Amino acid sequence: MFRHSNSSAISVFATRRAWLLKHKLLQVMFMQEDTRRLSGRVEVDDAYLGGRLTGGKPGRGSENKVSFIAAVQTTDDGRPLLACLQKLKFTKDAVSQWARKSLCASARVVSDGLNCFAGVTASGASHYPTVTGGGAASVKIEQFHAVNTFLGNLKTAFAGTYHCFNFEKYADRYLAEVQYRFNRRLDLSVILVGLVRAGASSKPRPERQLRAAEPWG
């Protein structure tokens, strides 16, 4: 029994240390990507993390669903270049605030016409809405191929890797990890080196900060 208890204690300690290390790395990724700004042609879409809780509301009203904006900068012919993700409520004010931070005035934003996306013009960007009508057919529209492919890959990766993390509390960090990796996918050699350098130069992150609901600057 002693051996069993001792092994359990070691396992709990190791899990806690692994969690802290993981979130320190996620925080570094978040800080590295926090100043990311997109320009040129940009596809945007509304997206959600999480699913229905047992006995909870279905669909977008689920208590476990977290909304976030997905934006993918592309070439003029639609090939993806960079991505920008942020947890937010789909209101015009929230999108306007995000646009001022994440879009250059030269951005040409393509959206599905959701009312809140009119807020992208707050950055000086131009907006070209295309009302899709929703449903399965809407994801096949060529104007949104890059962002739809990106979101499909993101959701598949999350479903296969993360099964029980707190979407509401830690979505910013996990989305930052996806963004960090995607934006460096064309030169994988810089991912580890850049992460080590950024981590070494960042200030210490005590556990209470890492467990806080919002990322710390």
List each language-model region with its residue ranges.
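Residue-level recognition of single "structural anchor" positions
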Residues: 1-217
